[in-house]
């Protein structure tokens, strides 16, 4: 019996809808997320306008063992974006539902923010949640005790933490104390100069796992403004 607090699923999956103005050799007919939902998860008016001009659909699905899912879903996303570029199309990620506004060469596992969206619905109660990490077999993350007035700094810390989670999962169980460095944050935010940032500045966090909702609960052990950005 495993002593790991967080269970590791055998396989994970992710799906993309390639939407094109003209039909390809094969066409799928999966019901698409509505515009309100796509907008809620960050899709822009410009991308939604492009989507309206692309009525034809090709479903691209990725399923792989959890141990290799990160590389598999990265390659699947690149494939979808490559096809979109070839056929003047657009790619919709199905979970979380959003239009992907990336070029194939921009796809990066290190740039963790590419792989999740933030749910601010309960920010007034001090809670910040991710949506998207499930595709790696990870639980979604909830950060507790977030100050709504300064949540942008917590957003940044979360980008650094998810950078580490994606890189270390499933080899390392995430539960317990952890340290998020300014370099981790830079990688998670997609900073091209991340590798040159000194590792000195950091903030400690405590990560717990709640099996019922299957979520990681994160508590910051300090003020990001003082620990990282002062």
List the predicted regions and their residue ranges.
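Long, low-complexity, Ser/Thr/Gly/Pro-rich intrinsically disordered segments that act as flexible linkers
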Residues: 1-42, 47-53, 192-196, 206-208
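Short, flexible beta-strand-to-coil junctions
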Residues: 19-21, 62-67, 167
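Aromatic/basic-lined ligand-recognition segments
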Residues: 95-230
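Amphipathic alpha-helical segments
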Residues: 1-2, 9, 83, 157-167
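Internal, hydrophobic cores of structured domains that mediate oligomerization or house catalytic pockets
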Residues: 26-129
């Amino acid at each position: 019996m495993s002593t790991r607090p967080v269970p590791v699923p055998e396989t994970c999956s992710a799906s993309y809808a390639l939407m094109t103005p003209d039909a390809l050799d094969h066409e799928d007919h999966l019901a698409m997320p509505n515009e309100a939902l796509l907008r809620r998860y960050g899709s822009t008016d410009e991308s939604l306008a492009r989507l309206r001009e692309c009525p034809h659909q090709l479903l691209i699905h990725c399923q792989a063992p959890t141990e290799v899912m990160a590389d598999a879903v990265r390659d699947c996303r690149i494939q979808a974006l490559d096809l979109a570029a070839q056929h003047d199309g657009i790619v919709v990620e199905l979970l979380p539902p959003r239009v992907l506004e990336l070029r194939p060469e921009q796809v990066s596992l290190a740039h963790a923010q590419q792989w999740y969206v933030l749910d601010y619905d309960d920010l007034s109660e001090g809670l910040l949640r991710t949506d998207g990490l499930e595709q790696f077999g990870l639980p979604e993350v909830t950060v507790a005790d977030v100050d709504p007035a300064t949540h942008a700094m917590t957003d940044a810390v979360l980008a650094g933490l998810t950078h580490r989670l994606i890189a270390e999962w499933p080899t390392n169980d995430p539960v317990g104390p952890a340290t998020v460095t300014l370099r981790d944050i830079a990688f998670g935010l997609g900073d091209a100069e991340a590798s040159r940032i000194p590792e000195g500045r950091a903030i400690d966090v405590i990560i717990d796992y709640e099996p019922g909702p299957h979520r990681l609960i994160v508590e910051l052990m300090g003020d990001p403004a003082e620990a990282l950005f002062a």
